Amino acid sequence: MNYSFNFFTPTQLLFGSGRLEELKEVAPKYGSKCLLVSRPLEGSLKIIYQRVEKLLNSVNVEVVFFDEIIPNPTIEGIEKGVIAAVKNQVDFVLGVGGGSVMDSAKLIALLHHPGGEINWEKALISYNHPFNYVASKQYTLPFIAVSTTSGTGSQCTQAAVI
């Protein structure tokens, strides 16, 4: 059995009680407009979304909500997110939620293209193995994750499931 592989995770993880406030320092480094990717803006998480929006607005970062993420995300959902990012000319993507949100937000950031179209055949060939390093493409957007669950660890890896 071959136990040889590469694992690349350029992730900075800020963990601990009260650390959400640091979003005010981190986010502006990536621009002044973000696409906040989430589940529908309802229920108990709505308070978190409002808090994140208030934090970002306090440092002059505009928030564009994309709240169409469903469990087990679909290609169609990712396409809608990319279109929202392009239409609103965002500078970075912020995922707030659990694994499905993180996976969707990562793919929206990765597959972002000014024309809004996604070449799925090329994407699935280029990004088909989580242990291979593939350089970011020209239009990839920065990605920030605010995890609200402790399940999949999607906020820490380069892999995404759709």
Question: Language-model features: where?
Answer:
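Glycine/threonine-rich beta-strand-loop-alpha-helix active-site module
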Residues: E76-I162
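ATP/NTP phosphate-donor binding region
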Residues: M1-F92
